[in-house]
């Protein structure tokens, strides 16, 4: 959503305060991270991550409909930004848990592989590097897409990529692989 401030400014003729208010629905879901954590504990990190990418697809595609300086489009934008924030919060919590699970699994397979202190800090460091790379690459790609073909193309591409990630998560899930072997 790195191009969001510029899009909101040009579409809705908003100033800094109006643009800042757009971030309220985007970040509100992060206050429910403890509930999301409970859901991850109950259903598993991969299922919650899959759900997050599935939520990404419609909200990205529906952002194409936000095109005019009308109350309807502003309300639609705020609703879609809430779902964008929800998907982001789901992914953040679930992926952090997944990092921990991978480290624990590797340490069980090969005790001491990460040294005396374990590999959790190193794994979170790598997670942070990957996340930061996305935070750099995402705005560059989004900006390029908006300049090249416009807002609708940018949100469509991000929706398609999210759909692709959902497919990858679904087909690589242990539950799906087991069903394929049984069938």
Please state what every model-predicted region is.
Residues 26-28, 132-133:
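Short hydrophobic/small-residue motifs within alpha-helical transmembrane segments
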Residues 54-71:
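C-terminal ends and interior cores of transmembrane alpha-helices
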């Amino acid at each position: 959503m790195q191009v969001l401030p510029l899009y909101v400014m040009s579409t809705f003729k908003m100033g800094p305060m109006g643009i800042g208010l757009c971030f309220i629905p985007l970040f509100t879901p992060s206050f429910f991270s403890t509930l999301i954590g409970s859901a991850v504990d109950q259903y598993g990190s991969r299922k919650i991550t899959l759900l997050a990418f599935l939520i990404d697809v419609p909200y990205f595609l529906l952002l194409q409909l936000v095109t005019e300086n009308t109350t309807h489009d502003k309300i639609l934008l705020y609703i879609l930004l809430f779902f964008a924030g929800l998907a982001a919060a789901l992914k953040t919590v679930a992926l952090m848990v997944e990092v921990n699970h991978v480290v624990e699994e590797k340490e069980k397979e090969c005790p001491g592989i990460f040294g005396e202190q374990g590999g959790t800090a190193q794994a979170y460091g790598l997670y942070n590097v990957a996340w930061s790379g996305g935070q750099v690459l995402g705005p560059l790609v989004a900006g390029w897409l908006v300049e090249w073909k416009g807002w609708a193309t940018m949100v469509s591409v991000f929706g398609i990529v999210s759909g692709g990630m959902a497919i990858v998560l679904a087909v690589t899930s242990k539950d799906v692989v087991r069903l394929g072997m049984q069938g």
